[in-house]
Amino acid sequence: MARAWGLLLAIGVVLPTWLSSTKVSSLIERISDPKDLKKLLRTRNNVLVLYSESEVAAESHLKLLSTVAQAVKGQGTVCWVDCGDAESRKLCKKMKVDLSPKDKKIELFHYQDGAFHMQYDRAVTLKSIVAFLKDPKGPPLWEEDPGAKDVVHIDSEKDFRRLLKREEKPLLMMFYAPWCSMCKRIMPHFQKAATQVRGHIVLAGMNVYPSEFENIKEEYNVRGYPTICYFEKGRFLFPYENYGSTAEDIVEWLKNPLPPQPQVPETPWADEGGSVYHLTDEDFDQFVKEHSSVLVMFHAPWCGHCKKMKPEFESAAEVLHGDAESSGVLAAVDATVNEALAGRFHISAFPTLKYFKNGEQQAVPALRTKKKFIEWMQNPEAPPPPEPTWEEQQTSVLHLVGDNFRDTLKKKKHTLVMFYAPWCPHCKKVIPHFTATADAFKEDRKIACAAVDCVKDKNQDLCQQEAVKAYPTFHYYHYGKLVEKYESDRTELGFTSFIRTLREGDLKRLEKRREEL
C-alpha cells in the first residue's frame, strides 16, 4: 500500500512538472465552453484557435503560440481548446474538429469577423504564423515556398548589413513587395537560379515594402518592385534590370555581370514606313470620311501585344492596299500621342481595333492575324452576338457574390460551391457537369449548387477568405459553415453521388430520431 501511495505521489509530482515546463502565455485563452468561444468570436475579429487531441499533443504548439500571442498582441487573439478534455469535447464536435485520424493530433483554425475563415495550412513557424495573423488575406512568405530554400531571406536592416559585411561571394539581392505581380513572376526563376549557383554566388530576397526600410530604399534607389542589385564584397556595383528573365538568363548573366546597357530609342511605327496609314487627332475624321471601309488599330509603343500584332497588320495592309479592287484600308493610331482620339473612343487596353463603314463606327470581332484581317476587310459583317456567360444562362446554379454569399449559404443545409474563373479551361470543361447536377436537385430546397466568379472585383476578397488558390475549387458548406474541400470526380456522376450521400445521411439521422421517439 505504501509503495502504491509512493507511486501516486511520484505521478503527482511528474504531471505538474510537465505542465510547468510548458510555458503557456497568459495571452493564450483556454476555452472549453461553446458559449465562451461564440462570445469571443463575436467580439474579436482575428482569432487563431489551436484544437488539440490532448495537453501532451499541444505542448510544442503552445510554446510556439505563446511567443506568437505576444508578437500579435492587440492585432490578433490566440486560443486553445483541449478536445481530450471531457468538458471541451462538445465544443470540438460543434466546431466540426475531426482529430480521429491517428496521425492528426492538432488543428489550427482561423476565424475572421465572427466566421470561420480557413484551416491554417502554412508553415508552423513563428515568423509565418505572425505574418499570417498580421495579414490573414496576404500571400504566404516567400521563404515558405520549398523551392526557395536556397534563397537567403533577409528580415531586418541589421541582417542585411551583416550579410553585406560578412559575405565573400558575389551577391544578387532582390528588393521586393509581397503584392507585386512582377515580383511573383520572377521569384520562381530567381529561386531556381539560386539553386543552380549555390556555393558560388548568393541570391537573396528582402521585403522592403514596410515603411521601416525607407533608408534602404533611398540608398539603393528602390523606386519600384522588384529592384535587383548586384554586390561584390559588400559593395554595390550595378542593378540587374532584366525583369522578364528566366533562371537560365540570370545564371548566364552571373557568369559575366555587366551594368545595364543604354537603350537605343525605338523608332516610332509611323516613321518606319510601310503600308499602314498613321492617323492623328487632326486628320482622323477626314480620313474615315474619305475611305468607305477603315480598320483602325489603337496601339501604344510599349505594348508587347501590339508589337506582336504589328507585323501581321502591316502584311495585311500590304495585300489590301496593293489590290486595286479593295476598298478597305488599315490605319493605326498611337494612343499615347493622340490622347483626344483615345479618350473619344474609350481606349483602355491595347491593341484595340475599331472599324468604320462610310464614316460610321461598327462592331468588329477579335482579329489578330494577317489572314483574319484580310478576310474581314473583304467581307466585313457584324460579328455574331457573344454567347451568354454562364451567369446569364437560365440554370439552377446560384451565382453568388461577396455581398450575398454568407446569407444565401446559411439558408441551405447542403451547398456545393464552385469557385471559378471564366477564362479557365478546366472550369469550362466542368461547367456542364456542375450545371446538370444543380438541375438534378433543383426541387430540393435544402440543397444548392452555387458558383462564384473569382475574377470579379467584388468577389476577390471572398475568394481569398475561402483560400481559393486554383480554379476550379469546390467547397461543401453546411448551413453556411465550410465543412470540407470537395476533391472527388469533377463529373455529373461525381457531384450527384456526393450530394446523394449527404441526403442519405440526413434520412438515416431522421430515422434514428424517430426510433428513439
Swiss-Prot record:
Record-annotated Thioredoxin domain positions: 132-259, 268-382, 376-504
Coiled-coil region list: none
BP terms from Gene Ontology: protein folding
Stored CDD domains: PDI_a_PDIR, PDI_b_PDIR_N
EC category: isomerase
MF annotations from Gene Ontology: protein disulfide isomerase activity; protein-disulfide reductase activity
SUPFAM superfamilies in alphabetical order: Thioredoxin-like (SSF52833)
Annotated signal sequence range: 1-21
UniProt keyword Plastid, yes or no: no
Positions occupied by motif Prevents secretion from ER: 514-517
An annotated GO cellular component: endoplasmic reticulum lumen
EC number: 5.3.4.1
Assembly with partners or alone: Interacts with CALR (via P-domain).
Family named by the database record: Belongs to the protein disulfide isomerase family.
Protein name: Protein disulfide-isomerase A5
Organism: Mus musculus (Mouse)
Taxonomic path: Eukaryota, Metazoa, Chordata, Craniata, Vertebrata
